[in-house]
Structure formats: structure tokens, C-alpha cells
Amino acid sequence: MSKIAIIYFSKTDVTGQLARAIAAGVEQQGIKQQGECEILSHRIEGSEIIEGRFVNPHLMDELAECDAIIFGSPTYMGGVAAQFKAFADASSESWYHQKWANKVAAGFTSGGALNGDQSCTLQYLQTFAYQHGMMWVGLDKISNSGEQNLNRYGVQGGIVAQGGEDGQLHASDVATAEYLGKRVAALVSKLSATSAT
């Protein structure tokens, strides 16, 4: 059985909506492949940050057992939220022992503006994954692909979404997030099959 983690921070739940859509995509792909896929979805909470440091050793142990980790954060001031950065900094022991090496990684972000430098957040998430020796998965859809207009912003590195005034996501952003979940789950399945032979 494969295990895919979705680790994110969300203040207004816009990024949380993306996380749930990604989880739905992972689940749909698992059903399609008639294989079981465990999903570990963890929203970073303020109570886990003590004197500026993220503290949750149990989560770090669980992440070491995952086949893929999908990272998410809203874009604040052109980068990840401080809460996510606290989590990233706390992963240094996992980095030192390369516990996440060769795992699949992907990322997602949201912002209040059409382009509030969300690509900088994705680039940070990519660099973070590369530091851990992970394999980054982006989107393989050009902008406005298919009936659902997947990847409406044309960002290949991961999911970028803009929350509406009502706090809801555009339908194509939800569909794109589901697609990324399916894509990561399919790749994990292929890699598992390859390593089993």
C-alpha cells in the first residue's frame, strides 16, 4: 500500500480547499488503479509552533514512511507563510539523515491577487524538496486544458490558485488540484511497480 502525505498551512481555508481537492484526486486514482493508497493530510497548526519552532516528532516519523509528500502554503509577502517555514526548518533532522530522499514531491499555493508572486512560493517548495533529495512533480497540462480548463494560470511547477471574495476557489483550480493528486498517485504507483521488479 502506498502512502501520500499532504502537509500544508491554511489561515482562511483557501489553501485547505486545495489540499482537500488534491486528497480527492489521490483517492480517485487509487480506486481507478484498484490499489490502496493511504492519505496523510496534516494542516500545520499554531499550537505546534513553540517559541518559533515547529514541534511534532510523530508527524516527522510518519513522513519518513510516506512515498510522496505534497507541500502547500498560501503566499504571504512573496513566499511561504511563517507557519510553513517553521515546519520546513524543523525537518532538518530528516534532511540530515535523508529520510525523504527519492520520495515524490509536489506543491500548491494560493493568494489573494491574480499574480501575487505565487511562483516564488512554488520555487521555495521545489528548493525545499530538492534539499531533501526528493523528485518534484509539476503539471503536464498547458493552460486552460480540456473541458475543465485545467491549469488556468499556465503554471507548470505546481498548483497556483486565487481565492475569490467569498473565500471559494474557482472550479478549474479545484479540478487542477484534483488532477495533481491523481498525477502524484499514478507516479507513485508506477515507481512502486518498477521497484518491485
Labelled PLM ranges:
Residues 123, 155, 171:
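Glycine-rich phosphate-binding loop at the start of an alpha helix
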Residues 1-99, 159-197:
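N-terminal beta1-alpha1-beta2 submodule of the flavodoxin-like/Rossmannoid cofactor-binding fold
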Residues 104-151:
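Short, glycine-/small-residue-rich phosphate/pyrophosphate-handling segment
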Residues 40-47, 141-151, 155:
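Short connector loops at secondary-structure junctions
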Residues 86-88, 125, 153-154:
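Short, surface-exposed, charged loop/turn segments at secondary-structure junctions
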Residues 96, 135, 146-165:
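Glycine-rich, flexible loop/turn motifs
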